[in-house]
Amino acid sequence: VHLTGEEKAAVTALWGKVNVDEVGGEALGRLLVVYPWTQRFFDSFGDLSSPDAVMNNPKVKAHGKKVLGAFSDGLAHLDNLKGTFAQLSELHCDKLHVDPENFRLLGNVLVCVLAHHFGKEFTPQVQAAYQKVVAGVANALAHKYH
């Protein structure tokens, strides 16, 4: 991902304020509610029968935290996202058979959640930088599919 120095600074500054537990669970939960077909990858998570059930599901929250932990690793290696996400790409492609479009959807949901949490601080410029990052992460995760 090519970010200007200003964009990198904006991404890093905001990410330092992110509560990974809270934002991760909310982002994954929203993905499962807004795009219900993504739930098929989470059969073992128990009750996903309603938006409330999804958003309060401890397994959704725990996996969301794990997902954002990996995203944090990516932010530390923006110049090598493909390498950073190679193993996760392989896992999601070969073993889990996740549609790579879901990575793009989750990235966009994450941007929405960040906008919700940070309000005016999440300026159009910050959003533009984050859109570049989530697109880069989605492409890296989809790399094994190509």
From Swiss-Prot:
Matching InterPro entries: Globin, Globin-like_sf, Globin/Proto, Hemoglobin_b, Hemoglobin_oxygen_transport
Residue numbers bearing the N-acetylvaline modification? V1
**Highest taxon of the source?**
Eukaryota
Q: Which residue intervals define the domain Globin in the entry?
A: 2-146
Q: Where does heme b bind?
A: H63, H92
Q: Which GO terms describe its molecular function?
A: haptoglobin binding; heme binding; hemoglobin alpha binding; metal ion binding; organic acid binding; oxygen binding; oxygen carrier activity; peroxidase activity
Residue positions where Phosphothreonine is found in the record: T12
Which residue positions does the secretion signal occupy?
A: none
- Give the matching CDD domains: Hb-beta-like
Point out residues bearing the modification Phosphoserine.
S44
One GO cellular component term of this record is: haptoglobin-hemoglobin complex
| Tissues and organs where the protein is expressed, per its UniProt entry | Red blood cells.
Tell me the GO BP annotations in alphabetical order.
hydrogen peroxide catabolic process
- Per the record, residues carrying N6-acetyllysine are K59, K82, K144
Q: Which residues carry this modification: S-nitrosocysteine?
A: C93
Keyword terms of this UniProt record: Acetylation, Heme, Iron, Metal-binding, Oxygen transport, Phosphoprotein, S-nitrosylation, Transport
| Function per UniProt | Involved in oxygen transport from the lung to the various peripheral tissues.
Entry similarity comment: Belongs to the globin family.
Q: How does it assemble?
A: Heterotetramer of two alpha chains and two beta chains.
Protein name as catalogued: Hemoglobin subunit beta
Q: Which gene encodes it?
A: HBB
